[in-house]
Amino acid sequence: MNTKTLPLVIEPDVLDKSLGYENLLIVDLSRPETYLKMHVPGAVHLDYSQIIAVSRPAMGLVPEDATLTRVFSALGVDEHTHVVAYDDEGGGRAARLLWTLEVAGHKHYSLLNGGLHAWVNEGHPLETTAATPTAKTFQLRRNNAPLADSAYISDRLGRDDCRLLDARSPDEYNGLKKYAERAGHIPGAVNLEWTQAIDTGRNMRLKTDEELNALLSPLGITADKEVIVYCQTHHRSAHTYLMLRQLGFENVKGYAGSWSDWGNNPDLPVE
């Protein structure tokens, strides 16, 4: 196996055997103090704030192309690089990096299944010395296919061939917790909190395909539909995006800004 054949969701033992491969870049989005304490050998650290933009009240937006080009070049990404991302929180930050790479036109990436939890708990090697990225030239080719905004979603409300999946907590979905001017959810959206896809009994891995489909199918989330995922800032829902991609869903989009955008716009409908 080489980097061209690495799967979308990679197991720790497979990554362990792949350490040192040419064109492999491992990116750690854990907290800085965690990274300095322990990380996958050779992994470079990336602060999550580098891959999101803010235009208050909207948070979690996609940065300008020039910003992404600068960040990914400094990180050491070029057209040949296969990025494996992980974090220490269950995969949300890592998944957001991979979704952002997709938006930037980069196709070669994997999510470490279980992240740092699985890597450490299953006895794989660790390093404490910070790795210095080797800068490369990243050629951004903007790809809007994985991206939805409020106008795009508004045009699809009520359509049978499109489903909205809210990855926030049930309390946020039902309007009992409010982190924007308005509470509730986008009309027609169904709710599956992002953590429901995580198997805490298997070191924070994704649940099996069968288990995930059993959660999704009753909600009307099936692979023949377009699915748009969102949360508060497209952090949690980035994990949901990767989960759906792993299941073979081909038409999936993430709403950058998510409820911090929709919930603060008085012109948009709310349930």
Where are these regions (language model features)?
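Positively charged, proline/Ser/Thr-rich regional signature most characteristic
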Residues: 2-79, 149, 154-224, 264, ...
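C-terminal soluble interaction/assembly domains
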Residues: 228-229, 247, 267
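Thiolate-centered catalytic microenvironments shared by cysteine-dependent enzyme domains
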Residues: 4, 56-156, 176-177, 184, ...
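Cysteine-dependent PTP/DSP-like catalytic domain, specifically the C-terminal lobe
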Residues: 253-271
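Residue-level signal for short, function-critical loop segments
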Residues: 43, 89, 233
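Small/polar glycine-rich anion-binding or flexible loop at a beta-alpha turn
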Residues: 228-236, 261
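Structural recognition of the beta-strand scaffold that forms the well-ordered cores
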Residues: 45-46, 82-85, 163-164, 228-229, ...
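Short, isolated positions within intrinsically disordered regulatory regions of eukaryotic proteins
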Residues: 103, 123, 198, 263-266
